[in-house]
């Protein structure tokens, strides 16, 4: 009986190890050439070449410590998307990315004054502790005058792990998926942010 349990445990561990290794071989990894900004697909085991930078194999969560700049991997993803948009004759650019917590507080206070309540203001400007801008993992593109480029990013952004997240903000994108995955459904507004 003991030998049977040991054998079953061995098979379980063996299958977990082999399953993990197989899965890692098949998890795609987007690699961007640092000079040409072109993309190549690798996998998480092989990784990227020295002349490339990884766009990551998952969503980009905010760190535990507040940053003072836009997330580096988010910038790589945006630069890759920007290069692809340019090839398609579209222009995309960041209007707003990282914001300090203090700046987000000011923007929210202005929105409260404009809309008359925190509840209504939250539809358009996320409260400071909810907004992903102070964490460096949100960008606003082409606002307010060039929604066509932002539309290109909405259609093609998933290739780069960038998704529009709010129905009422065509300009707001976040790295909520791995490059190549499908973007989640839009939420109505910033009041529905996860975190």
Predicted regions and their residues:
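Bacterial N-terminal signal peptides that target proteins for export
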Residues: 1-8
């Amino acid at each position: 009986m003991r030998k049977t349990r040991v054998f079953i445990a061995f098979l379980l561990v063996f299958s977990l190890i082999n399953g993990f290794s197989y899965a890692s071989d098949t998890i795609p990894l987007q690699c961007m050439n640092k000079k040409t900004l072109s993309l190549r697909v690798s996998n998480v085991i092989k990784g990227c070449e020295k002349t490339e930078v990884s766009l990551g194999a998952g969503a980009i969560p905010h760190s535990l410590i507040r940053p003072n700049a836009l997330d580096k991997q988010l910038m790589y993803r945006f630069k890759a998307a920007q290069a692809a948009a340019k090839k398609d004759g579209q222009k995309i650019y960041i209007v707003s990315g990282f914001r300090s917590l203090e700046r987000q507080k000011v923007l929210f206070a202005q929105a409260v004054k404009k809309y008359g309540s925190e509840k209504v203001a939250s539809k358009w400007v996320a409260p400071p502790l909810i907004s992903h801008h102070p964490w460096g993992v949100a960008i606003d593109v082409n606002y307010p005058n060039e929604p066509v480029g932002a539309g290109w990013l909405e259609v093609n952004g998933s290739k780069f792990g960038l998704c529009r997240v709010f129905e009422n903000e065509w300009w707001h994108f976040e790295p909520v998926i791995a490059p190549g995955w499908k973007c989640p459904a839009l939420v109505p507004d910033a009041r529905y942010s996860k975190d």
